[in-house]
């Protein structure tokens, strides 16, 4: 139960940095402005909206970190660096249990779909970057549950089944 490196954790770190910038407990950061814009409220009035939004909502603030980092914000850059390092640590831990090299790791989630984040994770792997092949799934994670249910119902799983899912599934 570790969310280090996740969109939620990066979004939560963005909000923490924004509030620390806002109230003077931390360095000034572009995240203060970007998070306030995303909230559509002044930071001083936004706490209820953040808590009501839950984890998925908080994860949407991860994209403010990318924008701030592109603008040269050191705080945002640090958040992204920490996230990439955390994900690389997860992958290193997994490599201990897999003998194949390169091991294949399927990565998914809103944040890791960004090519820049994926490249940061590869870089954070350092000398072990050739020990793991990072791939993105071509179907949503829920596809696995659908396959299980279809098999239980005696429905054959064919390439047409998969292509129909890819064509029709919308979150």
Each PLM stretch: what is its role?
Residues 15-171:
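ATP-binding/phosphotransfer module of carbohydrate and carboxylate kinases, centering on a glycine-rich
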Residues 1-21:
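Hydrophobic alpha-helical segments and helix pairs
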């Amino acid at each position: 139960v570790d969310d280090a490196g996740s969109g939620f954790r990066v979004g939560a770190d963005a909000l923490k940095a924004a509030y620390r910038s806002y109230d003077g407990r931390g360095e000034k950061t572009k995240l203060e402005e970007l998070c306030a814009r995303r909230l559509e409220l002044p930071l001083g009035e936004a706490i209820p909206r953040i808590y009501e939004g839950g984890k998925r909502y908080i994860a949407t603030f991860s994209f403010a970190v990318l924008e701030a980092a592109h603008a040269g914000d050191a705080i945002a850059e640090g958040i992204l660096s920490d996230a990439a390092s955390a994900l690389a640590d997860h992958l290193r831990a997994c490599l201990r249990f897999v003998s194949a090299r390169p091991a294949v790791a399927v990565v998914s989630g809103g944040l890791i779909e960004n090519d820049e984040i994926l490249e940061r994770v590869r870089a954070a792997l350092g000398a072990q970057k050739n020990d793991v092949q990072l791939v993105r799934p071509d179907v949503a994670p829920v596809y696995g549950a659908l396959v299980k249910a279809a098999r239980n119902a005696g429905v054959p799983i064919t390439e047409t089944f998969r292509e129909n899912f890819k064509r029709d599934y919308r979150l």
